[in-house]
Amino acid sequence: MGNLVLIADDDRDIVRFVALNLRLEGFDVVVANDGQDALDMALDVGPSLILLDTMMPRMDGYEVCSRLRDQRPDAQIPVIMLTARSMEADRSMAYTAGADDWVTKPFDPAVLVSKVKDHLRDQGTAS
């Protein structure tokens, strides 16, 4: 379970693209297509890392991250926000909600995979 990544994004093309690149690097992937499902899966499955879109139906990524941190304060699950937003205020909101990192769309998949590996290595869960 040390390589399980939850991808939470309502854009199915982004999900397929990210999932493919992570699987090619040996990661297992689970997917949520809205914020509520993302929170439920994060709490139920306990992924090693979460890639979280900021703008999703039912609950935005900031709220998902904040609720996850509130409901599981002991869980040290790294959260990387994926977003089309590039304003500093948005980045600040992400970090305030408890995010560990930020990637702006469009992104280089090699950079994203590298960030995933770095955060898992920092957590001691990368294989």
Where are these regions (language model features)?
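Charged docking surfaces used in two-component/phosphorelay signaling
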Residues: 16-24
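Short hydrophobic/Thr-rich beta-strand motif most characteristic of the beta2 strand and flanking loop
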Residues: 26-33, 41
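Active-site beta3 strand of CheY-like receiver
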Residues: 45-51
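Receiver (REC) domain active-site loop signature in two-component systems and cognate sites
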Residues: 56
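C-terminal output helix
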Residues: 107-116
